[in-house]
């Protein structure tokens, strides 16, 4: 009995100490760790590497895992966050397609055996996957802009075709769509229950993986949507430049950027040694192996946990993978420093950004069309937009990456509108070149829409130098 009483006494004492400790922390009588800049961890914009959760030195395997974006528990996101007196007006979503089969094969090796049929009880799983498959099977009469109407609405090959979307890719975008549904529809009522076709704007390139990714996100966002209300427009260019694709100066920037990439590769003796070793394993000339872009296929093996290929001469291994991935990371770092890609990005991203602000400006006038815009695209679409916005530290677009522009109206001052920019759920608005100094100049909590409009209409051309003040002049500048 005495032992039992002592045990109960100790238990009560422990509970009391825990309560006191939590109370002191709540009232900030015990200091809690805060970042050096004084911001709380909740408000800190995590576009920069987080020293607590990320390796102190760049780790190629860690970066590759982030790139794979393997579906897991629901992620935390900052979409839809604004002061209570702001009303959400429109949302503009740019996505990279989900996980896909490689575009290239390592010469003389067996293709990775990945099943591109959709199976509801196979990992990765999503609660809406079976319903998605059923709904897609009813969409054969969907009316899309040619040539999209000739593409399959979902992946369905026991052995994936080159570049085909995988089940992982479908699940990634079902998750994206459901997350956006919870925030924009359930919380902010962006669209009415009886939404109409003209309240959506949907555009995709002519690849099955982008159309299917767009449909997966759309199904997560608007489950069991009416096929008669869905119309995807076809975009021939990965830059989504529509009728403004001819731009000689942009092409010159790209040529110089590709030259920079080539020279950096030549300087990397370890990379050349690795390519040489791999070429011997598969018994092809080093030049042929390099041209096959082996990292594309190796990433598929890595993301799907499939062994790297072997021949009688040996096996491609993780060390080879690390060397090539490390070079990719170094290439991205030098790309930011040299600014050639930045020049390419300003001109490459201008048409799609110009379309976006035009759509936003129409929404500020009270127009109810195109309140939700979705561009289903590629890494080579999102990467220039990120660079042009000044988000130089943003990671290269992972599978199923999402970049979102939100337009908000101040209910207390209805004529004033603001924007938020989010990348993979992180609020990066105040990292953009057009709003990074906003808090120094204004007490307003949100970035004014005028900042983005001025950036697209004027500042993008100023950043290029020269005397051009519009897209045509900047694209045809002499003496570049």
From Swiss-Prot:
Catalytic activity: 3-O-[beta-D-GlcA-(1->3)-beta-D-Gal-(1->3)-beta-D-Gal-(1->4)-beta-D-2-O-P-Xyl]-L-seryl-[protein] + H2O = 3-O-(beta-D-GlcA-(1->3)-beta-D-Gal-(1->3)-beta-D-Gal-(1->4)-beta-D-Xyl)-L-seryl-[protein] + phosphate
Compartments, as annotated in UniProt: Golgi apparatus membrane
Xref: CDD domains: HP_HAP_like (cd07061)
EC number(s) on file: 3.1.3.-
Tissue: Widely expressed. Strongly expressed in spleen, fetal liver, moderately in placenta, pancreas, kidney, thymus and colon.
Transmembrane stretches, start-end: 7-27
Annotated family: Belongs to the histidine acid phosphatase family.
Protein name, as recorded: 2-phosphoxylose phosphatase 1
Organism placement in taxonomy: Eukaryota, Metazoa, Chordata, Craniata, Vertebrata
Gene: PXYLP1
